[in-house]
C-alpha cells in the first residue's frame, strides 16, 4: 500500500513519536491518522528493516483479528522512503478526534461525574488487560495517548511500538514527561506490565483532580513527590542495584489519598493505593482491578 492513496487533511501534532497527520481514505471516506517514523536499517548485506521491527509490527497486525473496542486499530504499515541508514515507516491508524487530556479539559466545572470516570476506567482497564494478556507493555501511558471517541469509547494508542519509536524519539527534541512513570522505571530497574498500572493510578487520580498527581522535574524529584504521598517504602521493597539508594530520600510516612483526591470514597481510595503500590510485585493487575468493587457499584451505595 502507498500512503499516496490517502489525502492529507491536517497536521494533528508533532510529538516524541514524530509528526501525525489526519488524512482521508477516498475509497471508504473514513479518516485515518498517519504517523511517519524513521527506523534505522538492520545489519547484513540487504539492510532494510531490522527483524525486531518486523516482529513488532507483525504482532500488532495479529491483534487486529480481535478487533478489541478499547484499542486503536493499526490499519496498515508501509515503508515509504529509504536511505542507506534508515527507512521511513508510515503507520496508518484509525482516527479519533480527541485524547483524554482534551476530554478532561472540555468537561465543565466541577469536572466529570463519578459514574463517567468509572465507565472510562473500566474501558481503559479492559484495553490494557487485553494488551497485557498479549504480552505487550505500553510503557508510556498518559492522557495524550488515551483517546476518547465522540460516543465516549476509550481507545489506547501508541502501544507495542517501543522499538520502532525509540530511534525517532532520540532524533526528536521533545521532553518525555516523567509524571506517569513507575518508580522502577525512574530507578532504572527491570520492569514489566506493572509499570502500566502505576500510570493508570496517576491517570485515575487526574480524572478527579483535572491536573496531574505527581509533577516532578527530574527522576529524584518525581520519586520525592511520590513518597510524599505513599511514604518512603521499606528497605525490603527497594530494588537492588539501582541508580538511587533508598538513603537518598528522607524518611516519611504515607498521607491519606483523600488529601490529594478528596472526591474519592473509601473503596476508590483503596483501589488507587493498590495501583500506586511501590513494589511492582504487589501492585494490582489490570485484570484484578477490573474485578474491584469500586468499579461495579453505583455512587452512594453502602461500602
UniProtKB/Swiss-Prot annotation:
InterPro entries in the cross-refs: CDK, Kinase-like_dom_sf, Prot_kinase_dom, Protein_kinase_ATP_BS, Ser/Thr_kinase_AS
Activity regulation text: Both phosphorylation at Thr-172 and binding of a D-type cyclin are necessary for enzymatic activity. Full activation of the cyclin-D-CDK4 complex appears to require other factors such as recruitment of the substrate via a substrate recruitment motif, and/or formation of the CDKN1B ternary complex. Inhibited by INK4 family members. In resting cells, the non-tyrosine-phosphorylated form of CDKN1B prevents phosphorylation at Thr-172 and inactivation, while, in proliferating cells, tyrosine phosphorylation of CDKN1B allows phosphorylation of Thr-172 of CDK4 and subsequent activation.
GO biological process: cell division; cellular response to interleukin-4; cellular response to ionomycin; cellular response to lipopolysaccharide; cellular response to phorbol 13-acetate 12-myristate; G1/S transition of mitotic cell cycle; positive regulation of fibroblast proliferation; positive regulation of G2/M transition of mitotic cell cycle
Single GO molecular function: cyclin-dependent protein serine/threonine kinase activity
Catalytic residues of the enzyme: 140 (proton acceptor)
Broad class of the protein's primary localization: cytoplasm
A Pfam family of this chain: Pkinase
Catalytic activity from the UniProt record: L-seryl-[protein] + ATP = O-phospho-L-seryl-[protein] + ADP + H(+); L-threonyl-[protein] + ATP = O-phospho-L-threonyl-[protein] + ADP + H(+)
Binding site for ATP: 12-20, 35
Entry keywords, A to Z: Acetylation, ATP-binding, Cell cycle, Cell division, Cytoplasm, Kinase, Membrane, Nucleotide-binding, Nucleus, Phosphoprotein, Proto-oncogene, Serine/threonine-protein kinase, Transferase
Protein family (similarity comment): Belongs to the protein kinase superfamily. CMGC Ser/Thr protein kinase family. CDC2/CDKX subfamily.
PANTHER family hit by this protein: CELL DIVISION PROTEIN KINASE (PTHR24056), CYCLIN-DEPENDENT KINASE 4 (PTHR24056:SF129)
Name used for this protein in its record: Cyclin-dependent kinase 4
Native organism: Ovis aries
Amino acid at each position: 500500500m502507498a500512503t499516496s492513496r490517502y489525502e492529507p487533511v491536517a497536521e494533528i501534532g508533532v510529538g516524541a513519536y514524530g509528526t501525525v497527520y489526519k488524512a482521508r481514505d477516498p475509497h471508504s471516506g473514513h479518516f485515518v491518522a498517519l504517523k511517519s517514523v524513521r527506523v534505522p536499517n538492520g545489519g547484513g548485506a540487504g539492510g532494510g528493516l531490522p527483524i525486531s521491527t518486523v516482529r513488532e509490527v507483525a504482532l500488532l497486525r495479529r491483534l487486529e483479528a480481535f478487533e478489541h473496542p478499547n484499542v486503536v486499530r493499526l490499519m496498515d504499515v508501509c515503508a515509504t522512503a529509504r536511505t542507506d541508514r534508515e527507512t521511513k515507516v508510515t503507520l496508518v491508524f484509525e482516527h479519533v478526534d480527541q485524547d483524554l487530556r482534551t476530554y478532561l479539559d472540555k468537561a465543565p466545572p466541577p469536572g466529570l461525574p463519578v459514574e463517567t470516570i468509572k465507565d472510562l476506567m473500566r474501558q481503559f482497564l479492559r484495553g490494557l488487560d487485553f494488551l497485557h494478556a498479549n504480552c505487550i507493555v505500553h510503557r508510556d501511558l498518559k492522557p495524550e495517548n488515551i483517546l476518547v471517541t465522540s460516543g465516549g469509547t476509550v481507545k489506547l494508542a501508541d502501544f507495542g511500538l517501543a522499538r520502532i519509536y525509540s530511534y525517532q524519539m532520540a532524533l526528536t527534541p521533545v521532553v518525555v514527561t516523567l509524571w506517569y512513570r513507575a518508580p522502577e522505571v525512574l530507578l532504572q530497574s527491570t520492569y514489566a506490565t506493572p509499570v502500566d498500572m502505576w500510570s493508570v493510578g496517576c491517570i485515575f487520580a487526574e480524572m478527579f483532580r483535572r491536573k496531574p498527581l505527581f509533577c516532578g522535574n527530574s527522576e529524584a524529584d518525581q520519586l520525592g513527590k511520590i513518597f510524599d504521598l505513599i511514604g518512603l517504602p521499606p528497605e525490603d521493597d527497594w530494588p537492588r542495584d539501582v541508580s538511587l539508594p533508598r538513603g537518598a530520600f528522607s524518611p516519611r510516612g504515607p498521607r491519606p489519598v483523600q488529601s490529594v483526591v478528596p472526591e474519592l470514597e473509601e473503596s476508590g481510595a483503596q483501589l488507587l493505593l493498590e495501583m500506586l503500590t511501590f513494589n511492582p510485585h504487589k501492585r494490582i493487575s489490570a485484570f484484578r482491578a477490573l474485578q474491584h468493587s469500586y468499579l461495579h457499584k453505583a455512587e452512594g451505595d453502602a461500602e
